[in-house]
Amino acid sequence: MNRLSLGARWLLASCISLSMLSSPVVHAESYAASYQAQPQMSMREQINQYWFRAAKEGDLKIINTLIDAKFDLNHADSKGYSALILAAYHGHDAVVNRLLLAGANPCHKDQRGNTALMGAIFKAEVRIAKTLIAADCQADQPNYNGQTAAMYAALFGRTELLKALEARGANLDQADPLGNTARRISQGELRTR
């Protein structure tokens, strides 16, 4: 089996939850119009919907309004995605910076253990990833498959981010259950079983 197919299998196994974040956003004429289309929603459900949509779409005005109203910055949806994870994944650096400034938890994990940093690395959001690397999180924080942000950076060839993670204290020799390390991955070695 060639290297590409091994890499493709590992990539699929390790990134499936991150790709789920890119599901299409349902655009409505306005937030109010979406409420009228779903009147059975409680006020809390509506606010949650506004919060997550604003994070995905980069709507800083709605984010600021809800922050000012003391909305729970770390509230997560049914998949464990926080507004910070969604904003990082969708490339909204102004929203990421505002959420961090307001006190959002940069170390929050979704239901698969992935963080906003892992999503930013996956999507090549370098500026956002650098911001999140500087946050007060364990540099080697693994997801529930034992994979770290450094492994993602190595897998996707994000050399600049891999160096930044190493400078922040990431152990490039920390292994996942298959024996993969960021160092090995960056050298083209990838174990799939």
Locate each region found by the language model:
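Leucine-rich solenoid repeat scaffolds
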Residues: 154, 159-193
